């Protein structure tokens, strides 16, 4: 699972601030969160099961690129998070911020959302940051998240999680391309599209690995 941020929400322009999004990232204690929900902590998107070379039984996480993409303490860095939060708030001219996180009404997602509701204000300061929660059925939540294309203010924060093909890990990144029709978040990047297309359709895509 990862936190989904609606960066084009006109009512909360700070969501488009890179430093603020980094503050949220570095402000998540993934080890304690995973322990609470009986899951494995991860600060990365590509899971440990995705293969890069079947002949050698090498997963992406086994490669030098996969290892180089890891962060100490699963990315949790409270001091860095607080610094980035303060800088973002100053840049946006804000003294206090209230955000709402939408989540599906299951026990697991409630636990995860409540964890952030408690930990982020404790880290950033309860007098400066508040996280409200809004539970709803999964189908309704999907509609809300995908509604950003016609209603930019459809949501602020939510959760996302995609299933990929272990034998073609690169294909899972289609969810973040500009042309994927069921995008949950307004991430659009021309360079990302080019890399995705090269990995999936270029003539030399099988020169290394699988």
How would you label these PLM feature ranges?
Residues 1, 138, 155-172:
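Ligand-binding clamshell of periplasmic/extracellular solute-binding protein-like
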Residues 1-48, 70, 95-107, 204-210:
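Alpha-helical secondary-structure segments
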Residues 34-37, 69-75, 129-142, 169-210:
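Extracytoplasmic/peripheral linker and loop segments enriched in polar/acidic and small residues
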Residues 103-118:
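Bilobed "Venus flytrap"/periplasmic-binding protein-like clamshell domains
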Residues 114-125, 139-155:
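Short helices/loops that flank or line small-molecule/ion binding pockets
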Residues 18, 78-100:
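Immediate post-signal peptide segment of exported/extracytoplasmic ligand-binding proteins
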Residues 94-100, 121-137:
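A local structural motif
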Residues 41-87, 106-110, 205-209:
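Structural transition elements
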């Amino acid at each position: 699972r990862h936190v989904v941020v609606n960066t084009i929400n006109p009512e909360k322009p700070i969501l488009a601030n890179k430093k603020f999004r980094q503050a949220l990232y570095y402000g998540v204690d993934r080890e304690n969160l995973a322990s609470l929900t009986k899951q494995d902590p991860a600060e990365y998107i590509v899971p440990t099961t995705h293969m890069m070379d079947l002949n050698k039984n090498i997963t992406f996480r086994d490669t030098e690129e996969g290892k180089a993409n890891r962060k100490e303490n699963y990315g949790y860095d409270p001091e860095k998070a607080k610094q980035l939060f303060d800088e973002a708030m100053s840049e946006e001219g804000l003294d206090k911020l209230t955000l709402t996180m939408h989540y599906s009404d299951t026990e697991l997602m409630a636990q995860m959302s409540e964890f952030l509701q408690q930990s982020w204000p404790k880290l950033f300061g309860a007098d400066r940051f508040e996280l409200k929660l809004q539970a709803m059925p999964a189908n309704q939540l999907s509609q809300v998240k995908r509604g950003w294309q016609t209603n930019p203010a459809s949501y602020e924060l939510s959760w996302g999680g995609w299933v990929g093909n272990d034998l073609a890990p690169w294909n899972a990144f289609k969810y973040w391309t500009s042309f994927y029709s069921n995008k949950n978040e307004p991430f659009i990047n021309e360079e990302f599209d080019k890399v995705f297309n090269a990995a999936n359709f270029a003539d030399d895509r099988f020169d290394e690995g699988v």
